[in-house]
């Protein structure tokens, strides 16, 4: 018998259903990726509601862009009432179905939970969250020992080395941030 964790093994959440769209059972999703091909090439998905722990497998019949959202036509969802029941479900795909990236690019799941160290070897913490700011991503690093949060921009200036395979990141220390005051004033 398959457990839920087995069901989600090797899968990655790429979007969340946020609304129904139209009267024919389409759903509006917000993507969790900037790589549009991940969404536009969807074929088969696992829809999973983390609150109710319900899941639903479906074939994607059509994908349409809609501003910063996408609209999906899914097999088995035939009308607006059925589509509204899917609000809150996350859209999962197999990790193997993700498009390949060059060595400088990464998917968020590849760096979440990575161990972060300063150049001198001092442990900073683990990547807990990635924040999109518009200009560049920022990693939120949490150290469980002292409950400190450190924010580091994901730019070449601050990221010295990122090893996706080892889940480790070497970063440049932001002196004013570490001292607790803005020394630039």
UniProtKB/Swiss-Prot annotation:
Localization, UniProt: Cytoplasm
GO biological process, one term: ribosomal small subunit biogenesis
PRC barrel domain location: 103-177
Gene3D superfamilies, per the entry: PRC-barrel domain, RimM
Sorted UniProt keywords: Chaperone, Cytoplasm, Ribosome biogenesis, rRNA processing
A cellular-component GO term for this protein: ribosome
Keyword Ribonucleoprotein: no
Coiled coil: none
Principal location: cytoplasm
Pfam families recorded: PRC, RimM
Source organism superkingdom: Bacteria
GO molecular function, one term: ribosome binding
Family: Belongs to the RimM family.
Free-text domain note: The PRC barrel domain binds ribosomal protein uS19.
Functional description taken from the UniProt entry: An accessory protein needed during the final step in the assembly of 30S ribosomal subunit, possibly for assembly of the head region. Essential for efficient processing of 16S rRNA. May be needed both before and after RbfA during the maturation of 16S rRNA. It has affinity for free ribosomal 30S subunits but not for 70S ribosomes.
Complex formation: Binds ribosomal protein uS19.
Name the UniProt record assigns to this protein: Ribosome maturation factor RimM
Origin species: Petrotoga mobilis (strain DSM 10674 / SJ95)
Gene from which this protein is expressed: rimM
